[in-house]
Amino acid sequence: MKSSHFDEYDKTLKQAELAIADSDHRAKLLQEMCADIGLTPEAVMKIFAGRSAEEIKPAERELLDEIKRQRERQPQHPYDGKRPRKPTMMRGQII
Protein backbone atom coordinates (compact mmCIF):
# COMPACT_ATOMS: atom_id res chain seq x y z
CA MET A 1 0.00 0.00 0.00
CA LYS A 2 1.24 3.47 -0.83
CA SER A 3 2.11 5.84 1.93
CA SER A 4 0.26 9.11 2.38
CA HIS A 5 3.34 10.90 1.08
CA PHE A 6 2.89 9.27 -2.34
CA ASP A 7 -0.87 9.90 -2.23
CA GLU A 8 -0.19 13.62 -1.97
CA TYR A 9 2.10 13.45 -5.00
CA ASP A 10 -0.51 11.52 -6.97
CA LYS A 11 -3.17 14.05 -6.05
CA THR A 12 -0.91 16.96 -7.01
CA LEU A 13 0.03 15.26 -10.28
CA LYS A 14 -3.64 14.73 -11.19
CA GLN A 15 -4.44 18.36 -10.39
CA ALA A 16 -1.52 19.50 -12.55
CA GLU A 17 -2.71 17.33 -15.46
CA LEU A 18 -6.22 18.80 -15.18
CA ALA A 19 -4.82 22.33 -15.06
CA ILE A 20 -2.77 21.69 -18.21
CA ALA A 21 -5.80 20.24 -20.02
CA ASP A 22 -7.93 23.23 -18.96
CA SER A 23 -5.21 25.60 -20.10
CA ASP A 24 -5.00 23.91 -23.51
CA HIS A 25 -8.79 24.04 -23.86
CA ARG A 26 -8.82 27.72 -22.87
CA ALA A 27 -6.07 28.52 -25.37
CA LYS A 28 -7.98 26.74 -28.15
CA LEU A 29 -11.17 28.65 -27.33
CA LEU A 30 -9.26 31.93 -27.23
CA GLN A 31 -7.79 31.24 -30.68
CA GLU A 32 -11.26 30.49 -32.07
CA MET A 33 -12.70 33.65 -30.55
CA CYS A 34 -9.90 35.79 -31.95
CA ALA A 35 -10.30 34.23 -35.39
CA ASP A 36 -14.05 35.01 -35.25
CA ILE A 37 -13.38 38.73 -34.90
CA GLY A 38 -10.51 38.74 -37.39
CA LEU A 39 -7.51 39.02 -35.07
CA THR A 40 -4.34 37.42 -36.36
CA PRO A 41 -2.27 35.19 -34.06
CA GLU A 42 0.45 37.86 -34.07
CA ALA A 43 -2.01 40.48 -32.80
CA VAL A 44 -3.19 38.14 -30.05
CA MET A 45 0.42 37.53 -28.98
CA LYS A 46 1.03 41.28 -28.75
CA ILE A 47 -2.17 41.83 -26.77
CA PHE A 48 -1.59 39.13 -24.17
CA ALA A 49 2.23 38.92 -24.02
CA GLY A 50 3.81 39.96 -20.74
CA ARG A 51 0.52 40.51 -18.95
CA SER A 52 -0.39 39.31 -15.48
CA ALA A 53 -3.33 37.00 -14.80
CA GLU A 54 -5.23 39.93 -13.26
CA GLU A 55 -4.96 41.80 -16.57
CA ILE A 56 -5.63 38.82 -18.82
CA LYS A 57 -8.90 37.67 -17.22
CA PRO A 58 -10.80 40.95 -17.83
CA ALA A 59 -9.37 41.15 -21.36
CA GLU A 60 -10.59 37.64 -22.15
CA ARG A 61 -14.00 38.45 -20.65
CA GLU A 62 -14.23 41.62 -22.76
CA LEU A 63 -13.24 39.66 -25.87
CA LEU A 64 -15.93 37.07 -25.15
CA ASP A 65 -18.55 39.81 -24.62
CA GLU A 66 -17.58 41.45 -27.93
CA ILE A 67 -17.93 38.15 -29.78
CA LYS A 68 -21.37 37.60 -28.23
CA ARG A 69 -22.44 41.11 -29.32
CA GLN A 70 -21.23 40.48 -32.87
CA ARG A 71 -23.03 37.14 -33.09
CA GLU A 72 -26.27 38.70 -31.85
CA ARG A 73 -26.05 41.41 -34.53
CA GLN A 74 -25.50 38.95 -37.37
CA PRO A 75 -28.51 37.04 -38.65
CA GLN A 76 -28.00 33.30 -38.57
CA HIS A 77 -29.29 32.72 -42.10
CA PRO A 78 -29.47 35.94 -44.14
CA TYR A 79 -31.57 34.40 -46.94
CA ASP A 80 -33.82 32.27 -44.78
CA GLY A 81 -37.15 32.10 -46.63
CA LYS A 82 -36.06 34.55 -49.36
CA ARG A 83 -34.45 34.18 -52.72
CA PRO A 84 -31.09 35.93 -52.87
CA ARG A 85 -31.06 38.92 -55.19
CA LYS A 86 -28.79 39.13 -58.16
CA PRO A 87 -26.05 41.75 -58.09
CA THR A 88 -27.16 45.09 -59.56
CA MET A 89 -25.15 44.64 -62.76
CA MET A 90 -26.84 41.30 -63.49
CA ARG A 91 -30.47 42.29 -62.91
CA GLY A 92 -32.51 41.94 -66.06
CA GLN A 93 -29.96 39.72 -67.78
CA ILE A 94 -30.89 36.21 -68.76
CA ILE A 95 -28.12 33.73 -68.30
Swiss-Prot record:
UniProt keyword annotation of Iron present: no
Keyword vocabulary terms for this entry: Plasmid
InterPro entries in the record: T3SS_LcrG_PcrG
Pfam short name (any one): LcrG
Bias type Basic and acidic residues, positions: 65-82
Domain of life: Bacteria
GO biological process: negative regulation of gene expression
Region (Disordered): 65-95
Protein name: Low calcium response locus protein G
Organism of derivation: Yersinia pestis
